[in-house]
Amino acid sequence: MNLKRRLSVSNDIELTPMMKQFLDLKAKHPDAVMLFRCGDFYETYSTDAIIAAEILGITLTKRANGKGKTVEMAGFPHHALDTYLPKLIRAGKRVAICDQLEDPKTTKKLVKRGITELVTPGVSINDNVLNYKENNFLAAVHFGKSACGIAFLDISTGEFLTAEGPFDYVDKLLNNFAPKEILFERGKRGMFEGNFGSKFFTFELDDWVFTESSSREKLLKHFETKNLKGFGVEHLKNGIIASGAILQYLDMTEHTQVGHITSLARIEEDKYVRLDKFTVRSLELIGSMNDGGSSLLHVIDKTISPMGARLLKRWMVFPLKDEKPINDRLNVVEYFFRKPDFRELIEDELHRIGDLERIISKVAVGRVSPREVVQLKVALQAIEPIKEACQQADNPSLNRIGEQLNLCISIRDRIEKEINNDPPLLINKGGVIKDGVDTELDELRQIAYSGKDYLLKIQQRESELTGIPSLKIAYNSVFGYYIEVRNVHKDKVPQEWIRKQTLVNAERYITQELKEYEEKILGAEDKILVLETRLYTELVQALSEFIPAIQINANQIARIDCLLSFANVAKENNYIRPVIEDNDVLDIRQGRHPVIEKQLPIGEKYIANDVLLDNATQQVIIITGPNMAGKSALLRQTALITLLAQIGSFVPAESAHIGLVDKIFTRVGASDNISVGESTFMVEMNEASDILNNISSRSLVLFDELGRGTSTYDGISIAWAIVEYIHEHPKAKARTLFATHYHELNEMEKSFKRIKNYNVSVKEVDNKVIFLRKLERGGSEHSFGIHVAKMAGMPKSIVKRANEILKQLESDNRQQGISGKPLAEVSENRGGMQLSFFQLDDPILCQIRDEILHLDVNNLTPIEALNKLNDIKKIVRGK
């Protein structure tokens, strides 16, 4: 049943005027929960009320809706909006905020209302909705004929980015930017979910939004330019369409004050290392795959400002692949590392800056509070010593940052002059503008505040004149200021006083003098609020002229913050500066896993390892060794050290020469994708296929236990073929680490000159395994899986039986040899490996065995067979 039918079941019953108003406004955004301002409350009705009550945990009640009818209602006080709105947004709801557009006191008719904002998961500037360490991106995807266009906008910071390319590139961007909401053309859901999955919050828009003409027109109008060449996106037809769709959506959601969106930047694919979503997830760059686990971001994020935290997260998934910008970052990190006084100065000032980026965005949209304006002033004051220190530093990169920082002295000093240092949160509370800023405001304050002092003087004077010591002057909203006299003294009241109210123990009076002062005082307070609001608005308008400069400041501060974080992490964890080289050599000495080493018990030292890969002598390393020995950790630490180096960080090692990597691929672990009909093995093969189709000579490839999802011989065959393909590839000889339990792959070293065998060593003492976690030359013969099973608490009978089977298998293999034998021949030789049903010495099983052995199957009728089955069933039940 639609909303209108729910509100009025029959056409004969008329809705109340307010409900008609609600329905008219609701029709503009039928899919959104509407918060309808009614006096001091925001109310929701009908299905919206049911949804709100469930999500917010508020009472569901009813409101009158015409003659004899009611409608569901749930509401909350208007001042609690910041508490309840985030809960609705986090629940994936779009919320239309409908406010009263006029003062109810000034009209006798229905109060005029309108939708002032549509808040969605991807479009919000509410601090309680936003995470200060994360961007809140809105994305739009356009499916073009030859490419897919994509755009990202964070309205809370003003960042606006676009790109286009094949589906896999767009998929990578979606996973790396992690938008909170994605827009696409109506009717394209199947195409979207088929390529990018169904995990995102999405919203469909009409097809006219995704046309080149409307999008280009919207962008040109917004940026006030004749073309888009200056942004470097003119050739991105599909990216332009996606970008224009985002601006159209801002109009639809009543976000029209967007002066802080000052540019549209192209995401330059060629500048960054390719990391697909599998790599980001399996390396646990941003979050852990396990509850309670840690991530690389958690270890290296020592940022101070919210802008720095957001930028660091971006750097993590967009490592650089050019030598100069990487070394520029490393040079700054080293300067911080070696100059503790400089580091301390910058740290102290960063603590004063706050979220400069989001504050200046609020200036543009007209939502900045007086306290945030003061914080902006404090930030600009803190930037001055940072600018001076950077300009004086013996480092060209810091010098350039210092040059770009703008002190915005005129607006900074104006804020200092005009705004109180500790203003209220809201302008309508008064006390925002300093004394001495405006003559009229000072005069009004004199009347308002000295007028109240004068009332006290009247009270003292009248008390003395009348001889009434308990006389007092007070105020209420019904008849304003009054004199209250207790009944015991009412005979002393002068005749000119006018009685207004009689109480049980007292009477209240007014005088002509009181009324005159009341008008002056109350009139002054109203005028003060109007004047303060006007002066504050003028200041904010002046501040909006500095948006571009302050955005540059925020970007540079974020950059400094990230590099300072790298230096502090390096100092704390004993990292060293990597050597970045434009070659194919990856030489890590005594490398450590940055996350695991932080999780070790106190006093336990991480076992460091060397890794050397190049395209000439040691291109592929095959790593064998027991379960739990540390093969997976070694693979991941190699990738993490490489990635840390290419985002400009020091690394956990004694030395590291990093030949630049253009792509990092990982095939580590697997999980079923049953929802789309894909098994573990299918997922594994899809990921491996993607890697092999995209590798280059500068790629770093990590395979861990490839082929586990199928039979042993299928797995060995596939693993062998993949390693051989990577080694023999005519152009893309990718540096590869291949961890496996297939010891047969150790034979490859004899036939392929750039494949080398290594193992993660263990020691066996008294039938117990000690994991040494050290990478050594040569292959391993054993996996020690049964030892691990024993450590996991497997029943002793199973461990014993497993050892028996293992000995038999090893004996068979020694006698016959598996290598080189056809799969069918080996399969025939598996007799005796399966547990015999009749070897179990259970009396019930023995009885069942006897029953079955004595059956004459050839002469057994169906009825007799069923009866015999019933007898066996009784034996099992013990009857």
UniProtKB/Swiss-Prot annotation:
Keyword Acetylation: no
Annotated CDD domains: ABC_MutS1
GO biological process, one term: mismatch repair
Record-linked Pfam families: MutS_I, MutS_II, MutS_III, MutS_IV, MutS_V
Assigned keywords, A-Z: ATP-binding, DNA damage, DNA repair, DNA-binding, Nucleotide-binding
PROSITE patterns reported for this sequence: DNA_MISMATCH_REPAIR_2
Domain of life, source organism: Bacteria
Gene Ontology molecular-function annotations: ATP binding; ATP-dependent DNA damage sensor activity; damaged DNA binding; mismatched DNA binding
Any one GO CC term of the record: cytosol
Function: This protein is involved in the repair of mismatches in DNA. It is possible that it carries out the mismatch recognition step. This protein has a weak ATPase activity.
Family note: Belongs to the DNA mismatch repair MutS family.
Protein name: DNA mismatch repair protein MutS
Organism whose genome encodes this protein: Bacteroides fragilis (strain ATCC 25285 / DSM 2151 / CCUG 4856 / JCM 11019 / LMG 10263 / NCTC 9343 / Onslow / VPI 2553 / EN-2)
Gene this protein is translated from: mutS
